Amino acid sequence: MKRKLFLTGPMGCGKSTAIAQALGAKLEKAGGFLTRRNGRDRLYFTLESPDGSQKATFLDFRGDSPRVDLSVFDSLGAKLLTGDFLVLDEIGGAELLEPAFMEALDRALASDIPILGVIKAEGPAGKLMDTLQLSEAYLEASARLRRRLAEDEDTLVYTCGQFDPQARLLAENWVKEYCP
């Protein structure tokens, strides 16, 4: 089993669920972060530590126009990228444009720390760019991250289908090997 496992695929296909179910109570021992979708009609997204003790809103659709605070990734996100193993759920969004966060992410990816994560699929990445009116630099950063993961011999990026049992099995096997 490769030290770094990332699940990707369409929104709502069960990537985060597979990771949460595979980790169970071990999730609270992880370093890294979770991005949480909150609300029903008026959405907002928070960045949270896996144990839930630290959180901050970084994207809010509750007003007339989306409010984005990517500094949350530089201040909180970068700080959370330490631990015996990391959960990164999810990367590949606008946080790729935040320098301090990207430095911390680069260090984590270059390290021997086991990582279990979700990487935003290319289609949703393009939609995010349009919705938030991000520059072309975002698509370039997204492509650079995908290339880096694809070229790393110690990383597996698995594309999930809808509620893919193989995704959960991969996550469970990763947990058995890398989580104390």
Predicted regions and their residues:
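Flexible, charged surface loops at secondary-structure boundaries
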Residues: 1, 25-27, 79-84, 109-110
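P-loop (Walker A) phosphate-binding loop of NTP-binding proteins
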Residues: 10
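Conserved lysine of the Walker
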Residues: 15-16
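N-terminal phosphate/diphosphate-binding loop that engages ATP/GTP or pyrophosphate donors
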Residues: 20, 24-65
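A structural signal for short, well-ordered beta-strand segments and their strand-loop junctions
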Residues: 32-34, 88, 117
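N-terminal export/assembly leader peptides and their processing motifs that target proteins to secretory
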Residues: 48-51, 71-79, 177-178
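Phosphate-binding/switch loop-helix module in NTP-utilizing enzymes
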Residues: 61-106
